[in-house]
Amino acid sequence: MSKNSKAYREAAEKVDREKLYTPLEATKLAKETSSKKYDATVEVAMRLGVDPRKADQMVRGTVNLPHGTGKTARVIVFAVGDKAEAAAAAGADVVGSDDLIERIQGGWVDFDAAIATPDQMAKVGRIARVLGPRGLMPNPKTGTVTPDVAKAVTDIKGGKINFRVDKHSNLHLIIGKASFDAEKLTENYGAVLDEILRAKPSSAKGRYLKKVVVSTTTGPGIQVDPGVTRNFLEA
């Protein structure tokens, strides 16, 4: 839905740009203003009161969405031997080591998450410049560097997503599909917000949640009241 299209303009007219909506109001409105041509992804964007240039103000972590993302994540695993077999059995899309690294060095990045066993990280470091900027670099803090690759694959396939604040202090996360019930989208939103609040750096000063916006991929942005941090299903 192009921002210049009639459909987008009509959708945008339904949104009060001066209002701060409750989470449930926002997800209902996101569904209502979504394109009817396809099942759009619903996202939440947040601006945080942190300075990510400071190491002690980097906000990152994982969240398990209770209702999943609505899409099947493509997961790759860097592992060999029994660990590689376990990853494949758990449903990893691609499993490898040097061969997988070479493939990525050749320009292939058609996946949503990367997992590695600890012994593979020295090799994976060779493609850090490719994976890092895309938020795909395996990291112990997000559970993607682990000897239990099977569990990591199962978690991600089941709706576990990673988050990391960008250099502009923004976060972008998927909370589902427009076909989800508004209540399920709101419960996913609540799970996300809980984790973001839990990840607040102790050194962050002032207002932490500066702005929260819910939207579908191509729909208008809907501002959510950042002061609503509990009882998410109340209208």
UniProtKB/Swiss-Prot annotation:
Molecular function (Gene Ontology), one example: structural constituent of ribosome
S-adenosyl-L-methionine in keyword set: no
Entry's Gene Ontology cellular component terms: large ribosomal subunit
Gene3D superfamilies the record matches: 3.30.190.20, 3.40.50.790
Family: Belongs to the universal ribosomal protein uL1 family.
Quaternary state and interactors: Part of the 50S ribosomal subunit.
Function: Binds directly to 23S rRNA. The L1 stalk is quite mobile in the ribosome, and is involved in E site tRNA release.
Protein name from the UniProt record: Large ribosomal subunit protein uL1
Lineage of source species: Bacteria, Bacillati, Actinomycetota, Actinomycetes, Mycobacteriales
